[in-house]
Amino acid sequence: MPGVKLTTQAYCKMVLHGAKYPHCAVNGLLVAERQRPRKEHPPGAGSHTLFVDCIPLFHGTLALTPMLEVALTLIDSWCKDNSYVIAGYYQANERVKDASPNQVAEKVASRIAEGFGDAALIMVDNAKFTMDCAAPTIHVYEQHENRWRCRDPHHDYCEDWPEAQRISASLLDSRSYETLVDFDNHLDDIRSDWTNPEINKAVLHLC
């Protein structure tokens, strides 16, 4: 499997989702730019998947529900309109010391892998979470022989960790998580935009 990297925007929105609902499990999707055919890649191009954005899905009880199907369909359509592809899944469990993927996480990630062969499953480690974001809080899993296995936990999976650390800490300090919209919020009020343009602008402003 190629390497995996997250942009600052993707990492920050994952962190903010967990911060908004600290006593709940949360999950979401990670999107990458749609890949060109392999023959179009320039010689020597690095082989890795770059998650450019994060789409927060649900908080509370995470299950394989009709609403998940609705979310996947809508987000897949949005991705096609913007030359993206659903390429990963993230989840933070309810219990602080539980950072292992459960059946829901593995099933959703496996479904994504059917459409994107290099899909990744990212588990957020709540035990590592601090307001100053001193260390990355993620574990990256890859699918190998139909099983999800944890990749090197010491590897840096952020495109620019110092930037991601600084901006996520700044957004937490300003309580930006209060304005984050996940798909649950969108279902409660369809005017709520799950692409989170305001947070995207805040990240860009801080870069």
Swiss-Prot record:
Keyword Protein transport included in the entry's annotation: no
UniProt keyword Membrane, yes or no: yes
Single GO MF descriptor: membrane insertase activity
UniProt-listed GO biological process terms: protein insertion into ER membrane by stop-transfer membrane-anchor sequence; tail-anchored membrane protein insertion into ER membrane
Cystine connections: none
Main subcellular location: endoplasmic reticulum
CDD domains for the chain: MPN_UPF0172 (cd08060)
Subcellular location as annotated: Endoplasmic reticulum membrane
Keyword annotations from UniProtKB, A to Z: Endoplasmic reticulum, Membrane
GO cellular component, one term: endoplasmic reticulum membrane
MPN domain: residues covered: 4-147
Pfam families: UPF0172
Membrane topology term: Peripheral membrane protein
Subunit structure: Component of the ER membrane protein complex (EMC). EMC8 and EMC9 are mutually exclusive subunits of the EMC complex.
PANTHER family assigned: ER MEMBRANE PROTEIN COMPLEX, ER MEMBRANE PROTEIN COMPLEX SUBUNIT 8
Protein purpose: Part of the endoplasmic reticulum membrane protein complex (EMC) that enables the energy-independent insertion into endoplasmic reticulum membranes of newly synthesized membrane proteins. Preferentially accommodates proteins with transmembrane domains that are weakly hydrophobic or contain destabilizing features such as charged and aromatic residues. Involved in the cotranslational insertion of multi-pass membrane proteins in which stop-transfer membrane-anchor sequences become ER membrane spanning helices.
Family listed: Belongs to the EMC8/EMC9 family.
Name assigned to this protein: ER membrane protein complex subunit 8
Recorded name of the encoding gene: Emc8
